From Swiss-Prot:
Disulphide bonds in the chain: C45-C51, C47-C190
Record-level GO cellular component terms: extracellular region
EC class (word): lyase
Gene3D superfamilies: Phosphatidylinositol (PI) phosphodiesterase
SUPFAM superfamilies (alphabetical): PLC-like phosphodiesterases (SSF51695)
EC number: 4.6.1.-
UniProt-recorded name of the protein: Dermonecrotic toxin LsaSicTox-alphaIB1ai
Amino acids binding Mg(2+): E25, D27, D85
Record InterPro entries: PLC-like_Pdiesterase_TIM-brl
Cofactor annotation remark: Binds 1 Mg(2+) ion per subunit.
């Protein structure tokens, strides 16, 4: 999965997919009542990027729905996965459940079109704080209450705080999550980060009793760091330059082992090294 980083304006969906992304990451900020409000990152952000592009969250979902609904004039067949980077740091811990509830209602209405031929992409809810695991509970219970529990088949999870892998496993246990787990590891492109924790995550994925289905590394903009991440066995790379990742994947060293995921590739299924 080539994951376009910080895609917060509708116009950027086309831009990143046209550069080779089959997945995008979008920032979601919340108001003080835990409503998802904007797709917005803000300053500071990655080096070389404009930090302030934004849409209202529900407006963005409408654009995303069009980009992932077959038959729509804006449809991109290859855009198959969306990571919502949920900026829950502005919320109190006791608002996490509400945030999950409100997020589910927004997606149901504006992305899934109440289950009637809505967008088809798989969704990863990426949460920065292990203490906010109840966001997952709120999300799940709301879709059940709204009579669309089947949409949970399209939803996966990530805790993005680079926490100890054992602590992440405990948070999933509390949230009752037993699959659909992506594990991120990374840092802004302005700084360097080694691959030690990525290797631990890959080892968990490849073990017989691990909780991780997929591992992705962020934010990778250079060919050398792309090769290092692929050599470590990651499933996804988040980048500001999808064309760079696509170029490296077409090198002879990688064409035998990796290919770009399509809609038919289940993002919750584990492939071991």
């Amino acid at each position: 999965w080539i994951m376009g980083h910080m895609v917060n304006a509708i116009a950027q969906i086309d831009e990143f997919v046209n550069l080779g992304a089959n997945s995008i990451e979008t920032d979601v900020s919340f108001d003080k009542n835990a409503n998802p409000e904007y797709t917005y990152h803000g300053i500071p952000c990655d080096c070389g990027r404009t930090c302030t592009k934004w849409e209202y969250f529900n407006t963005f979902l409408g654009g995303l729905r069009k980009a992932t609904t077959p038959g729509d004039s804006k449809y991109h067949e290859k855009l198959v996965l969306v990571v919502f980077d949920l900026k829950t740091g502005s919320l109190y811990d006791n608002q996490a459940y509400d945030a999950g509830t409100k997020l589910a209602k927004s997606l149901l209405q504006n992305y899934w079109n109440k289950g009637n031929n809505g967008g088809r992409a798989y969704i990863v809810l990426s949460i920065p704080n292990l203490d906010h695991y109840k966001l997952i509970t709120g999300f799940k219970e709301t879709l059940t209450k709204e009579e669309h529990p089947e949409l949970m088949d399209k939803v996966g999870y990530d805790f993005s705080g680079n926490d100890d892998i054992g602590d992440v496993a405990k948070a999933y246990k509390k949230a009752g999550v037993t699959g659909h787990v992506w594990q991120s590891d990374g840092i802004t492109n302005c700084l360097l980060r080694g691959l030690d924790r990525v290797r631990k995550a890959v080892a968990n994925r490849d073990s017989s009793n691990g909780y991780i289905n997929k591992v992705y590394y962020w934010t990778v903009d250079k060919r050398a760091s792309t090769r290092d991440a692929l050599d470590a066995g990651v499933d996804g790379i988040m980048t500001n330059y999808p064309d760079v990742i696509a170029d490296v994947l077409s090198e002879s060293a990688y064409t035998a082992k990796f290919r770009i995921a399509t809609y038919d590739d289940n993002p919750w299924e584990t492939f071991k090294n």
